[in-house]
Amino acid sequence: MNKLLYLLSVAALCMSGPSIAAAEAETAAEAEQPRFSIKPTARLLADGAVYAPDGQGFTDGVTLSDIAVGVTAGYGKWSGRVDLGFGYFKFAMKDVYVQYKFNDRHLLRLGYFIQQFGLQAAYSKSMKPTFETPVSDSYMGATPRELGLMYNMSLPCYFMGLSATFGTIGDLSAEKVTRPQIGTLGRFVWRPVAREGAVAQVGVSAWYQSPLYKRSNEDGKGSFNFSANYPTRVAKVKMLGATLQHAGNQLLVTPELLLSYKRFALQSQYYYMNVRRHRGLPAYEAQGAYVWLHCLLLGDSSYKYAPSVAGLATPGPKTLEVVAGYDYTNGSHKDVHGGISNDVHVSFNYYINKYLLARLGWRYAMARDSQALMADFGGRHHVNIIQARIQFRF
């Protein structure tokens, strides 16, 4: 009898084995099936500022400098994003793209977004730890949103971003534009040390692009427009500015440096721009540089690293950070008086939680030999700025 029961048990196990294996295989197959996901996003920036001296465009006050709503969606290795912004009583298209992520090391993105160019490309416009993008970066147009196709590669010790760009939404919608700025660019980074608490990174980016062509341009030659406001959002006063007619192609190069150790970090870039000109006019050159020093005062005890963008990660909740920096820009060269600026600043950033942060900062910004300031300030002006920001995002 016992032998009979034993034989029946063995037979039952043998019969159930294939069904169990089939069930496990079916469960694994279901787990591997891609799923569609969708998530709303929102961002709000409330800024307040006091200026000394004030007047002539520098008016103390508060403003909602940026309101954005959007949606992100994903399906397997595919994902996309659409953001619509509203600020200063104007609607503006923000990020609009679709991307394919081959794996954790390679991705391809197509749409309207900020390309990988220089260290500033690692941080969104609203997440600059010094409130705003460096004046050098703004003046030379190093990190605008552009229509483009981008390929990114992120390896343990190397990062690379390659793009082809086809101008901005503003260029394509402007009157009399016959051809937008078209270019190619790349960012190349070497990071022999890149982990939480220790980063040593160097890199270089290069961008070569054509000018903007309009029907009104004489002899079919192109033009470039370079400008930067004083680094504050409550008052919008142009600090530097130059318009180049009879322009040829532009070359923009920026080496970068990022170092961090525990609660301290340093990041810096140098910019060099050269624009060829026609009709025997001399080439236009501009240059600039900035350096930021970071320190975590409370909360996190060391800086984290974001390998997918080759930059510092956002500090964690309940972390207080101080950032001090200096920015120099020289946009004046031969017959072009774009302006020369100096900017010194200190910012305190408190990351309350993953949805909310507060910033408080002081900066001294001065410009001279600037055609943009000629009418109101005789080409030269300085201002002290105390500003605060509450930022909400999810």
Model-derived features with residue positions:
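N-terminal periplasmic/intermembrane-space "pro-region" immediately following the signal or transit peptide
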Residues: 1, 7, 13-45, 302-305, ...
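Hydrophobic alpha-helical membrane context
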Residues: 14-18, 78, 378
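Outer-membrane beta-barrel pore domains
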Residues: 55-56, 219-394
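Glycan-binding loop/region signatures in secreted carbohydrate-active enzymes
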Residues: 39, 197-201, 208, 212-236
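Hydrophobic alpha-helical segments, especially transmembrane helices
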Residues: 3-4, 360
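Single-residue recognition of alpha-helix boundary sites
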Residues: 13-14, 167, 273, 365
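Outer membrane beta-barrel
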Residues: 29-52, 56-212, 295-301, 306-314, ...
